[in-house]
Amino acid sequence: MIRRTLILCAVAALSGCGTNLREVGKEPSLSPVGSGIDGGNTSALYKYPEPPRAPVKKFSLWDDRQSRLFTDPRALSQGDILTVRIKINDRANFKNQNDRSRTANRKLGFDLSAQWDKWSTAGKGAGALNSATDTTADGEIKRSETLELNVAAIVTDVLPNGNLMITGSQEVRVNAELRVLTIAGIVRPADIGAENTIPYERIAEARISYGGRGRISEIQQPAYGQQVLDQVLPF
């Protein structure tokens, strides 16, 4: 029985860190675009109603999809290219302190006595229960991130409601280090500027990754064996 229990505990511990073991030696993977809309169901993107069709007028320069008449056409169809401007300057400072104290005292007593036909019984009892808990927690997070880049993205799909799914990547190699920038998300055509550009904060379900591969990244990462032990050992 004990052996079976130990085996079940070991299997549960390994299954809990199975996902992390797949990322040993790799960067954390991004979730698919659209997974944050309907509980991870990416097919929800195609359930939006289609916009009403605009009447087509021959020999007309106006297009309802283009809100500007005297500017160059913007990305609207599959295969079109637009520029994404990424300018991130985030700073976060969180500090949390929590103190909790609780004391409880419980007392119980009883007295029992009886007499019948020269027989008597008598008894007394008392009990006490004391408990005390004290919890103190203190945490602080400081983070500062700055990133300013431009990357070209291509329209990979047009959703039924007219929104565009885009994806793009950029690779730059400097000596023995390769820098990789990827962008993916959902864009509303009306948010695309006159210069066929869009800021990153206008991209829904944005997935932005900026990392690298090469000698510097290999030195910064712990050894594979150390990463495996960090995920498997429970202490």
UniProtKB/Swiss-Prot annotation:
Covalent lipid adducts (S-diacylglycerol cysteine), residues: C17
Record localization: Cell outer membrane; Bacterial flagellum basal body
Molecular function GO labels: cytoskeletal motor activity
GO BP term, example: bacterial-type flagellum-dependent cell motility
Main location: membrane
InterPro entries named among the record's database cross-references: Flag_Lring (IPR000527)
Lipid-attached positions, N-palmitoyl cysteine: C17
Membrane topology: Lipid-anchor
PROSITE patterns assigned to the protein according to its UniProt record, in alphabetical order: PROKAR_LIPOPROTEIN
Record keyword Signal present: yes
Keywords: Bacterial flagellum, Cell outer membrane, Lipoprotein, Membrane, Palmitate, Signal
Signal peptide boundaries: 1-16
UniProt entry tagged with the keyword Signal: yes
Recorded GO CC terms: bacterial-type flagellum basal body, distal rod, L ring; cell outer membrane
Functional summary from the UniProt entry: Assembles around the rod to form the L-ring and probably protects the motor/basal body from shearing forces during rotation.
HAMAP family tied to this protein: FlgH (MF_00415)
Family statement: Belongs to the FlgH family.
Quaternary assembly: The basal body constitutes a major portion of the flagellar organelle and consists of four rings (L,P,S, and M) mounted on a central rod.
Annotated protein name in UniProt: Flagellar L-ring protein
Species assigned in the record: Mesorhizobium japonicum (strain LMG 29417 / CECT 9101 / MAFF 303099)
